[in-house]
Amino acid sequence: MLFACLLLANPLPAQEPPTIAYRVEVTPRDDDDLVSAIRAVSQLIKLEETAPTDGYGLLARARADLPRITEALRADGFWGGAVRIEIAGRDVTRPDASPQASDPANPLPVAVILTPGPRYRIGQILMRSEPVQEDALLEQAAADLRLAEGDPARPADILAAEAALLLALRRAGYPLASVVARDAVVDHDTKTMDITWRIAAGPLADFARPTVAGTTRTDPALLERLAARRLEGQPYSPERLERARRAMMGLGVFSFVRANEAPALSQDGRLPVHFQVQERPRHAVGGRLGFETNYGLTASGYWENRNIFGGAERLRLEGEVARIGETGVDNATYRAFATLRTPEFLGRDLQSVSQIGAVRERLRAYDRDAALASFTLEHRLSDTMAISGGPNYEEGRIGRDGDMNDFRLFGVMGTFRYDNTTNPLDPRQGQRFSISATPYYSALDSNKFARVLAIGSSYFDVTGDGGSVLALRAALGSAPGADRDEITLDKRFYAGGGGSVRGYTYQSIGPRDKGNRPLGGASLVETSIEWRQRLTRNWGMAAFLDAGSVGEDSKPDFGGLHAGTGLGVRYLTAIGPIRLDVGVPLNRQKDDPSFAIYIGFGQAF
């Protein structure tokens, strides 16, 4: 009696049903894409190693896979296809298909047997408009359909074609275009699918005056004015709306900007647009480290106040110390600047950039102590093009070996920039080009000269996935009509070092004095070719060949090129690559190193 009570008080644990080891094989295997699609949807395959189950669970998995795999066949255009799943040779649809326990060393065979049949094709494509008088408009939009008779009858392709059709209508100025109905009829006799779309284009519309919400420190009137200049009264187009959104993001004070279109037109027949924004933290700090053999360590940092006055103005204080370690801290180079960027300057589509700074440079080519000030107006011509210009002033002392002379320079700078790349630190496709011209006037000796510099680079994504990139760069500089001695030391052209010709010491290429120090020149030629190869998710490499020359007069010297070559390693981060390059000079001169190491953030160009 006592024994029975103990059993009732402490019941024996329920025995777990034995798990079954199994292995899945998909047949036939002659269509790799189809097999991959099946493996992507099959729970039998996904849970094979990670989630053991018993016989009933395995049977449930197999039966649940039947509709999934059937849909996968249809998604690839096999509308008449069939699938059969067998466990140890038994069809899982049979009532007696429940599998028995198996030896883990001999897993049960699970066969997924496909009978895809022929792939169905697109038959007739019809588009009907509501109202009927818009048929001509649909015929025009159909040029962007991306679907034609005879194409595989894949649902994803049909939906993509539908989206392309609506986008074409929206680009034509119809913001409310919609699909009223889509009829897809499969004919199993002809193995085709006929598609009929009924489309309502809706009315043509212009943009209404945009509204903005979500600001906490930024004046919303500023943003509404910026958006209205680009949208209000303009014919509707998704691209125009996206450009306005990017213009707001370009202010640099928002973490995101979302453009929401109204579902209906206003009473005056225009489309209201509402922008929702979220501001970034008001303050930001950052820094950068770099290293170059025979130049030393470079460290820079900045502090930024975004939206300092409520008009999306940005004040940045930044400093840099360079040549740390090459000659000791006493001969290091120091730079400090304060920059204020003001968008919508004077209520126009201009950005003003006011900058003051001080530099103390100790270089092999010259020593300079100077104060600088500049005022620049920038205007974007498009998403890829911008122009800028304005006056600048420099005053200080410059010379060599302690023989310093006073100088005062007035200049007026003008710049054109083109850039259609998407990543400033790691460009993989596109082009960049800039040309700047600055005439200078020396107030102390009444000397006049000008400096012109053009730089271009192209990037080719050879494999289409960013894994293999060919990068090309060229630069041409000239001081038209001037000899080298008429140009102040810091405004002369120099070549050599990181960002120029790797393998050589900074500024070392070109004419030299009796002490073997660079004199600079009145013209510049540089060219680079670099192959960038991704090896793994986080690692890559580069092979490069750089060349450059500095001419004594304003005519570029193509005959005196000095070349350097080498290899590099890239550690790829979410922000940009960390770069380590080793360059070897091919035209060594006196005191040139046998190699040089460069470490920095971002690609070399």
Across the structure, where does each feature detected by a protein language model lie?
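Periplasmic polypeptide-binding modules associated with outer-membrane biogenesis and secretion
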Residues: 15-33, 46-293, 316-334, 368-371, ...
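Sec/Tat signal peptide C-region and signal peptidase I cleavage site
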Residues: 10-14
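Conserved active-site loop/cleft motifs that coordinate metal ions or position small ligands
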Residues: 541-544, 577-583
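Bacterial N-terminal signal peptides
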Residues: 1-9
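Gram-negative/organellar outer-membrane beta-barrel architecture
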Residues: 132-140, 237-434, 501-503, 507-522, ...
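Short, solvent-exposed loop/turn segments at secondary-structure junctions
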Residues: 197, 549-553, 586-588
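Beta-strand secondary-structure signal
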Residues: 23, 70-72, 82-84, 109-113, ...
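Extended beta-strand-rich architecture
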Residues: 272-280, 288-304, 380-381, 388-390, ...
